[in-house]
């Protein structure tokens, strides 16, 4: 798997705030650190890979200019810091890549962008065109307009979504930790975990919170790595200090093995990025049919319609106890579905005998465990 990552053609590289700022105050962008990172990125690109960078650090970079000594928690202050810091951050990225004659392109995304299929496609096209034109895409969450509860939460998840969005061959998550340990790596009894093949390898792992200037701790990195690996993308998790060997031969850090069958772009989007408009509760038989049998969802297996939604919107599919089993694109609006609950297909009027959610537009979590 490490060879697969080292030979990957299209790679998304995520760099955390702590890897871009200096050690003294933790909220000043360090040009030397960025230069070191860019040197390694350039070497990988010269070897033939396409790279997309997901860069944290906007809020941290805006703290010093605004006289903030601690990371802001108030949304408006955080957004102000991001607005100031993003300018500083992109300036440093631009200066560093200019040493190699490479332009950069800023791509700011929100969860709302990823949640709408047309916006997600536009972002994908922009990133692809930047690469074709020889520019390095630098992606970050648009903190100045993102709102609490409608955001990615951290750039680790954003990186996983971008990796699938651009059909990446590998995702490299860089922070200030050498890889995954079963407990805090400062504990002398902590054991390093080299490979994660499935959830069993994570049993007993204790993942802590984020650092002083970032939002994504080890828990978020593990979550993002599993998200990407479930969608078919191998992941390497290591420290920014190891970026050279990480991009050269991937013989450092922790590798998360991908699922064998890569999710289609639509199914990944529906499961992990799309906005949902309502919910549909199923009986046990319908749950079995759509999760294990790969069947379309029929009206006969539905017990409850929750919320108001339109035909073509994405809804959550629930089991009898309310557990979320998947998501799908509905063929009918909620008012129409209310009249169809529990009915056999042959008893429905003409024009209402299509599946409620066709198997091609139904993605379940059980198959990605």
Curated annotation (Swiss-Prot):
GO terms for molecular function: ATP binding; glutamate 5-kinase activity; RNA binding. Pfam families: AA_kinase, PUA. InterPro entries: AceGlu_kinase-like_sf, Asp/Glu/Uridylate_kinase, G5K_ProB, Glu/AcGlu_kinase, Glu_5kinase, Glu_5kinase/COase_Synthase, Glutamate_5-kinase_CS, PUA. Keywords: Amino-acid biosynthesis, ATP-binding, Cytoplasm, Kinase, Nucleotide-binding, Proline biosynthesis, Transferase. It catalyses: L-glutamate + ATP = L-glutamyl 5-phosphate + ADP. Substrate binds at residues 56, 143, 155. Pathway: Amino-acid biosynthesis; L-proline biosynthesis; L-glutamate 5-semialdehyde from L-glutamate: step 1/2. It is found in: Cytoplasm. One of its GO terms (cellular component) is cytosol. Coiled coil: none annotated. Catalyzes the transfer of a phosphate group to glutamate to form L-glutamate 5-phosphate. This is Glutamate 5-kinase. The lineage of its organism: Bacteria, Bacillati, Actinomycetota, Actinomycetes, Mycobacteriales.
């Amino acid at each position: 798997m490490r060879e697969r990552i080292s030979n990957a053609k299209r790679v998304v590289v995520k760099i955390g705030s702590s890897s871009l700022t200096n050690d003294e105050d933790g909220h000043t962008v360090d040009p030397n650190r960025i230069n070191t990172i860019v040197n390694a990125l350039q070497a990988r690109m010269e070897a033939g890979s396409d790279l997309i960078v997901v860069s944290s650090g906007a809020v941290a970079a805006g703290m010093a200019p605004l006289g903030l000594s601690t990371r802001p928690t108030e949304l408006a202050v955080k957004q102000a810091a991001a607005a100031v810091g993003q300018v500083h951050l992109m300036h440093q990225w631009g200066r560093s890549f200019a040493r190699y004659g490479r332009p950069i392109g800023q791509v700011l995304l929100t969860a709302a962008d990823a949640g709408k299929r047309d916006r997600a496609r536009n972002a994908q096209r922009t990133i692809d065109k930047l690469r074709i034109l020889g520019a390095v895409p630098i992606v970050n969450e648009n903190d100045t307009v993102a709102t609490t509860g409608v955001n990615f939460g951290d750039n680790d998840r954003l990186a996983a979504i971008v990796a699938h969005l651009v059909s990446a061959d590998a995702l490299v998550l860089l922070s200030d930790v050498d890889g995954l340990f079963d407990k805090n790596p400062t504990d002398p009894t902590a054991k390093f975990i080299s490979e994660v093949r499935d959830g069993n390898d994570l049993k007993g792992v204790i993942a802590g919170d984020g650092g002083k200037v970032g939002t994504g701790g080890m828990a978020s990195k593990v979550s993002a790595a599993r998200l990407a690996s479930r969608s078919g993308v191998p992941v390497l998790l290591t420290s920014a200090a190891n970026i050279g060997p990480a991009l050269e031969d991937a013989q450092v850090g922790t590798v998360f093995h991908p699922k064998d069958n890569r999710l289609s772009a639509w199914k990944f989007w529906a499961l992990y990025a799309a906005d949902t408009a309502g919910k549909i509760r199923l009986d046990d038989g319908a749950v079995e049919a759509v999760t294990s049998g790969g069947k379309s969802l029929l009206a006969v297996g539905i017990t409850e319609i929750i919320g108001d939604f339109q035909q073509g919107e994405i809804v959550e599919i629930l089991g009898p106890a309310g557990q979320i089993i998947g998501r799908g694109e509905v063929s009918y609006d909620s008012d129409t579905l209310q009249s169809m609950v529990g009915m056999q297909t042959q008893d429905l009027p003409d024009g209402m005998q299509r599946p409620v959610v066709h198997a091609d537009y139904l993605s379940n979590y059980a198959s990605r465990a």
